[in-house]
Amino acid sequence: MIQHAGLGYRRDLAEDFLSLSENSPICFIEAAPENWLKMGGWARKQFDRVAERLPLALHGLSMSLGGQAPLDTDLIDGIKEMMRRYDCTFFSDHLSYCHDGGHLYDLLPLPFTEEMVHHTARRIREVQDRLGCRIAVENTSYYLHSPLAEMNEVEFLNAVAREADCGIHLDVNNIYVNAVNHGLLSPEAFLENVDAERVCYIHIAGHDVETPELLIDTHGAAVLPTVWDLLELAYAKLPTIPPTLLERDFNFPPFSELEAEVAKIADYQTRAGKECRRAA
């Protein structure tokens, strides 16, 4: 089971992961199953060696939980086998859609409507039934707000999770990015109203500032102070401290800087003075 603070596994960082010291703050890794289901060769051997040392969380990119196309059962079965192979007990994916007659290669927003709540929750239940375990859904960054919305973002997230009986994967950077870009829901209001009992996993990441009113969720920069403050607030609001992962996808600094950010997560967890829960 995963617990405490972790770092997303990227092939560019393989040698660094293989060289982790015993006192490294990195307690688990996360990988996108789509990147590994058909991967072999040296890259897979490195991944396997790291996954033998550290617990693994799986975070999907293409389940298209809110999409209209039929669910990809081959993908779900592949994820189930990967979870079995690596003794992985946690899987999450985005509350979005990414298929429309083919892969769209982006995570597109869903309209916050009752109809979409029922549609998405039904599909999540199908995924859970096929996987044989509970999953978690992540709040995504979005750049176009649907005029069809009947509720705000956190109400939609709560409603889907409640109807599907799934966990909530909270991305604090996405909360901040959406608050700045749309001005519809403050980060504080989001955290005050999220179903805290369902929050079982957290992401934190950096973003790019295009203009003061436009932030882009890139995972290509260090976490900014405003987002660290939001993580601290999240820990204060939640009954227990979920496993929390630092996402970094490119523009990699020296690995010691990434470890320092993971250590900062661990420090915030300790200062919160609450039980650290396991995600399963």
Curated annotation (Swiss-Prot):
Tell me the protein family, please. Answer: Belongs to the UPF0276 family.
Record-linked NCBIfam families:
PRK05409.1
The name on file for this protein is UPF0276 protein NMB2142
One short Pfam name that applies is MbnB_TglH_ChrH
What InterPro entries does this protein's entry cite? MbnB/TglH/ChrH (IPR007801), Xyl_isomerase-like_sf (IPR036237)
Q: Which domain of life is it from?
A: Bacteria
Cross-referenced PANTHER family: UPF0276 PROTEIN HI_1600 (PTHR42194:SF1)
